[in-house]
Regions:
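Rossmann-like dinucleotide-binding domain that binds NAD(P)(H)
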Residues: 70-142
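Short, well-ordered coil/turn segments that N-cap beta-strands
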Residues: 26-27, 54, 131-135
Length: 142
């Protein structure tokens, strides 16, 4: 089963889908388009075969310009589920599946319309892994 994100905005619904796939002995994958990007694939290959040395830091910068329609943003799950999820996936994939040791996230909302939804429009995230890897993400809706 190949699913597009978000599978759900509720963790228990995602777990139900995973459990059903396991019970049915079916593969279950959530696809992220950056893993198909030739440049990211080349980077992953170079990291995997040691061609560019040890991964010590990942920095990513994502923008969503122009800002998506408010109708979409109301159902998107928020900036973490809509935008940052792609950066988190890249960190997990490029790091070989390392699990974060600590995470710091800060954000703000400049748009009154987005603020009314209880969401943010600018976020910075730092992640530290036990291997020493440090990652930084800066994301903004515009």
């Amino acid at each position: 089963i190949f699913a597009e994100k978000p599978i759900s905005h509720e963790v228990h619904e995602v777990q139900e889908a995973v459990d059903l796939a396991l019970k049915s002995n079916l593969p279950f994958v959530c696809g992220y388009q950056r893993r198909s990007d030739l440049n990211f694939r080349a980077l992953k290959e170079q990291l995997s075969n040691g061609a560019i040395g040890q991964l010590k830091m990942i920095k990513s910068c994502s923008r969503d310009n122009p800002v998506p329609p408010l109708e979409y943003l109301r159902t998107s799950g928020g900036i973490f589920q809509d935008m940052l999820i792609h950066d988190f996936d890249m960190q997990e994939w490029l790091s070989g599946g390392q699990v974060p040791e600590s995470v710091l996230a800060v954000g703000h909302c400049y748009s009154p319309e987005i603020q009314q939804m209880g969401d943010l429009d600018i976020v910075a995230v730092m992640v530290k892994y036990s291997s020493g890897l440090v990652t930084m993400i800066d994301t903004c809706r515009d």
